[in-house]
Amino acid sequence: MRIGIGIDVHQFAEGRKLIIGGVEVPSPIGLLGHSDADVLLHAISDALLGAAALGDIGKHFPDTSPDYKDADSMELLRHVCKLLEQEGYKPVNVDTMLLLEKPKIAPYIDQMRRNIARCLGLEINAVSVKATTNEKLGYVGRQEGACAHAVCLIENA
């Protein structure tokens, strides 16, 4: 068994959809990025890649490549799962924490968990998505961006 940790940050921008955990969350602003900027799925991808010592998402999906322009991060996560499988690993569980002031995402957490569980081939009780504010401190508190942390456990397939 191996443990991985991932973190991702994206700034907010006008004219972008807010996609978190594969769910489009109603919001007047979204997250800026080369792909769909799904901060939660990016953190999970990094955690899984790290657990298998396969580098990070920047190595596998560079933001300089037109191939990943506006990419669906759920598809990127599926690719990460294939990389794990090729190395003889499979995910066991994922625990995540999302930091943002607004909008409140509690109504969307169950769907995020279902999306992630389905993508990783896990039962929903093996996927945790939590959210908190930053108590108005720092870039998250000023509503300039969002941050996600993820920890995962993988095992030999």
From Swiss-Prot:
Residues the entry annotates as binding a divalent metal cation: D8, H10, H42
GO BP term (any one): terpenoid biosynthetic process
Residues carrying the site annotation Transition state stabilizer: H34, T133
Pathway linked to the protein: Isoprenoid biosynthesis; isopentenyl diphosphate biosynthesis via DXP pathway; isopentenyl diphosphate from 1-deoxy-D-xylulose 5-phosphate: step 4/6
Cofactor descriptive note: Binds 1 divalent metal cation per subunit.
Top EC class of this enzyme: lyase
Highest taxon above the source species: Bacteria
Subunit structure: Homotrimer.
Name of the protein described by the UniProt record: 2-C-methyl-D-erythritol 2,4-cyclodiphosphate synthase
Lineage: Bacteria, Pseudomonadati, Chlorobiota, Chlorobiia, Chlorobiales
